[in-house]
Regions:
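Active-site-adjacent pocket scaffolds in enzyme catalytic domains
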Residues: 4-71
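C-terminal domain-boundary segment and adjacent tail
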Residues: 58-123
Length: 123
């Protein structure tokens, strides 16, 4: 998905945003994820409970937070209203957000905010 030539978020090839050359311009790529994604409720070998989703997100966050002590990290979580919006699933997201907000030096934001930050600081 590309937003008005500002950034694209249809890449899975890295953990942090990066620039590519597009013609004579630079195109910002903001990576997306398939593993920290509620779409796994709808696929084989995916999540079959909110608790599994929560545990996977928590384990991913814990690993990245530890790694982030030496360099910045980004954790993308893919969410779709028709999937995460179910009562048994939304609780796992609320529980995860409650967990991570207890940590210092984290930023919970939208992809567009990441793009704006990257454009401002790393153009």
């Amino acid at each position: 998905m590309c937003i008005r030539d500002r950034y694209c978020s249809d890449t899975y090839s890295d953990d942090l945003p990066y620039w590519i050359k597009k013609g004579n311009k630079k195109q910002l790529m903001v990576p997306y994820t398939l593993d920290n994604n509620d779409m796994r409720f709808a696929t084989n070998q995916g999540f079959n409970s909110g608790e599994q989703f929560y545990n996977y997100l928590k384990d991913s966050f814990d690993a990245l937070y530890e790694e982030g002590k030496t360099s910045p990290k980004m954790m993308s979580v893919g969410l779709h209203c028709r999937l995460i919006g179910r009562p048994g699933r939304i609780q796992s997201l609320k529980k995860f957000l409650n967990y991570i907000t207890k940590f210092k030096d984290i930023w919970i934001c939208k992809r567009v905010d990441i793009a704006k930050h990257w454009i401002k600081n790393y153009s």
